[in-house]
């Protein structure tokens, strides 16, 4: 009986061993990395890290409008907090956030009179915008290296195209070989449309005399059009092209507030759409349409979009003060800023009134 059990045990062990060997063989027979799975030359992408490094971002810190024409909802926080914007979190300890905000107040209050004037706020906005600019310059150095592996300081459109398609999951070596041999790339319609738009943008960033190559500075303009007047103008044209319904290259209020593609399916969506219309109507009438003639020209939109426009910074400073200026003295006290902390930081500092005098 014992010998029979031993035999069955040995047989079972042998079966499990064979099963393990077959599974192991199957694993080693597969590609070493999921990214090697191909569909018509396209690899299965594992993440979009590479894409984020070389694609122009939709969101530009310190710029009033997104690349797609949406208003930048975080603009006020970005130009008030600068790089510290991420430090203000709803989950952060309120007392610590109050102290951070008080420290910022002291920096803005240049003449130390315990209140912030429009000129002081304007100077601060320009400083924080420059901070965002420098951050983009530093990031661009890393991103440029990603598309310039040979380090010659110049990148051709084909070199960028190879890296872009690789970030989308295509086999980099296969794409390079096909481009070298002028062979057709099997690219889906959506990716091709993105490529076409990027190509237009690429050649716009190529400063005269055009050599079809981008250096590091030109690549910065390609990723961040706010760093170049020429590219800022191109960005404005793109936004107007997308919103302009009658082709006159100008924007009426109705064109500017037109809802995004899609239908309202429930009350929550309706509320979102109502907010969209209200916010854009206010921005159009009070800020963008500078001469209030009911028409926004390319020049007006370009001036509105320019983050280094000092006149815009002063207007923004006055608007920010007006939001929290409860005593209507055209200045902001620390208490007023703490009370309207959600506007300035995106984080509501609870029980500010009870604590402000204790702490400061």
From Swiss-Prot:
Question: So where does Ca(2+) 5 get bound?
Answer: 325, 327, 329, 331, 336
Q: State any GO CC term.
A: Golgi lumen
Q: Which CDD domains match?
A: EFh_CREC_cab45 (cd16225)
Q: Which residues bind Ca(2+) 2?
A: 148, 150, 152, 154, 159
Give residues annotated as binding Ca(2+) 4.
Answer: 289, 291, 293, 300
Q: Give a single Pfam family match.
A: EF-hand_7
Signal sequence: where?
Answer: 1-29
Q: Where does Ca(2+) 1 bind?
A: 109, 111, 113, 115, 120
Q: Where in the cell is it found?
A: Golgi apparatus lumen
Sugar-bearing residue positions: 33
- Name the residues that bind Ca(2+) 3: 244, 246, 248, 250, 255
Domain EF-hand, chain residue ranges per copy: 96-131, 135-170, 231-266, 276-311, 312-347
Checking InterPro entries in the record gives: CAB45_EFh (IPR027240), EF-hand-dom_pair (IPR011992), EF_Hand_1_Ca_BS (IPR018247), EF_hand_dom (IPR002048)
Q: What is its main location?
A: Golgi
Keywords from the UniProt entry: Calcium, Glycoprotein, Golgi apparatus, Metal-binding, Repeat, Signal
SMART domains, per database record = EFh
User: What Gene Ontology terms describe what this protein does at the molecular function level?
Assistant: calcium ion binding
Quote the function comment for this protein.
May regulate calcium-dependent activities in the endoplasmic reticulum lumen or post-ER compartment.
Concerning its family, UniProt says: Belongs to the CREC family.
Name it: 45 kDa calcium-binding protein
> What organism does the record attribute this protein to?
Xenopus tropicalis
